[in-house]
Amino acid sequence: MSKLLIPLLALAPAFAQDPRQIILEVQKRQHSDSQRYEGTLEVISQGNQVATKRWTYQRIGSFGNSKAILRFTAPAEVKGVGLLIVNHPDRASDQWMWRPAIGRDQRIALQDRSTRFFGTDFSFEDLEERDVDQYDYKLLADEGATWKIESRPRKSSQYAYSYFWIKKDNYTFVRIEAYSKKGLVRTIDYKDQEQIQGIWTARVTEVYDVARKSRTILKYEKLDYNLPMKDDDFTLQALRREL
Amino acid sequence: MTIASVLLTVLAAQSFEQRGFVENRTTAYPQTAPNDSGHVVDEILVREDASYKLTPWLTVNGGFDARMDSHRQTAREWVLNADDRSIPRPPFSLRRLSATMHRGRVTAEIGRQLIRWGKTDILNPTDRFAPRDYLSSVVDADFLGVSAARVTYESGGETIDLVWQPWFTPSRTPLLNQRWTVVPPQAAGVNVVDAGARYPGGSQYGARWNHIGAGYEYSLCFFDGFQNLPSFDVLFSPMTQTAALTRVYPQLRLYGGDAAVPLRWLTLKGEAAYFTSSTPGAEEYALYVIQLERQVKEWSFAGGYAGSAVTREAANPLQFAPDRGFAKSFVGRAGLTIDANRDLAIESAVRAGGSFVRFEYSQLFGQHWRATGGIAWIRGDMADFLGQYRRNSYGSLAIRYSF
């Protein structure tokens, strides 16, 4: 072992115990310049009624400073409905929804981001990315295979705080519990993790809306990273261009 | 070899997208009208929209309607109508047939297309390239396509939109012998005849600049063209007691703007336009809308006031003007998403002399079927724009299969 590695290894555990550094490491390991997938969503209501939706998702840019377009492909009546998300490192994202049936886009105001997105259990806020510097972190527990970290948003959010569970071996999210001042609002579980193009990726995300007792299971298909994409395809004009 | 590789590249980039629906809508009117004894109207509409991406920068778009109804609102002819100027609805019409090209920050669409301007939801004074089909309902009108060339330049938060419309497309008005045309009591005993329309010959153009800031956005726009809502020229024959009505469309120039500003609890939206006209005797006026909206959990609310101010009175009082008819109204809309499949909506407009309220319940069945049931209640004085339709309260049921 080289002399250089010895102090680095000695530092590693202490370094890893800093929750902000853990989150930074998560972002670093999941970094990609672009991402594309086709998602199948099953929205399961309290009465076990299942509604199935599909969307395509494309993102360009690095985490927290990216642009994404999400477009429904099913059911037939919402085909073409799109959402443009422009994430900013220093503030909440800008979001616009496009409804081709009426030919209008609608800006989603910040105070409306806690609303569920198109009947799913995701809120508009859940679809945005916020940079690591928009939160304060606290390491709550070392639970063997995972760290439990508390995050508190520095800027406006529907959530007062959240708990993250992060796997130690591959620095991926396992679970998020998101709380308002009144209590638990939403849980998000990341399942079926596998390496895609060297990036550990959950193939299934399950969101549970505590108040509605409703679940949305998002399955990722045809997921690729680092595809060639252009900035011009992530603008309001691009959102309107598609059918 | 080079040609083959270019062709392969083009073919690989091609993609076809489509969506459409078949809808049967039944509307029941408990009351008859003086010019319409029908109680039930059934309409069938097939709508198909498709796009074909030939290259990454070129897409061809098509939109097609086929329709029929039980009340002679649709012409009984087997002709494809490409300009949507007919007095009755055409059985087959092109809503869209256009090519969209984009390169860098510029997007151009040429051909028949839908163009929407404005930010408010209840009434859009600046939405001048969007004629509507009021034939079977003044309170629930669909949009018509226009033949135009549109070039949009987008850079960061700035967007400039230039539109040139060489052929005029009017809004479609209610048929004279049906309930959504209310013949004034003074014309009782007069035989009212539809003498068609005199369409203006020139082109229309407009420009809009939109600015997106951190959380807010606003735009300014200009339009020079024609009013797509008609005034009526009357030719009265005392011998036969016949009044022949011809639709005419005054010249119109618009200076307008709109803005959306999120406040702490609500989003404030406003839209205003001032209309002038070089046509002698045509009205000059301003329309404005102030609207507040908010989403709270599964509820969405939008409410506000639509106002108007006339700066030059019209010499011709015979006009079909739902945009001004809905002005001087308090308007509101509330929607509830019950779950992933069920929605509820309430919409209302209240004026000094008339009011309108509509309830709608909608449910999706499986992946394709949706049923929407509604009740609309209209009340008011005969002298009021809304109140004159007080015999047109209705219940409706629409069954839609989307594909």
Model-predicted segments: where are they?
Chain A
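Gly/Pro-enriched, hydrophobic low-complexity segments
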Residues: 16, 24, 73, 84, ...
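Sec-dependent signal peptide recognition
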Residues: 1-8
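Short, flexible active-site-adjacent loop segments at beta-strand->alpha-helix junctions, enriched
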Residues: 89, 101, 111-112, 136
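N-terminal mature ectodomain segment of secretory-pathway/periplasmic proteins
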Residues: 18-100
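Short, ordered beta-strand-loop transition motifs
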Residues: 60-66, 139-146, 196-197
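Short, solvent-exposed mixed-charge patches
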Residues: 242-243
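Short structured motifs
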Residues: 21-24, 40, 53-56, 133-139, ...
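Hydrophobic h-region of N-terminal signal peptides that target proteins for export
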Residues: 8-16
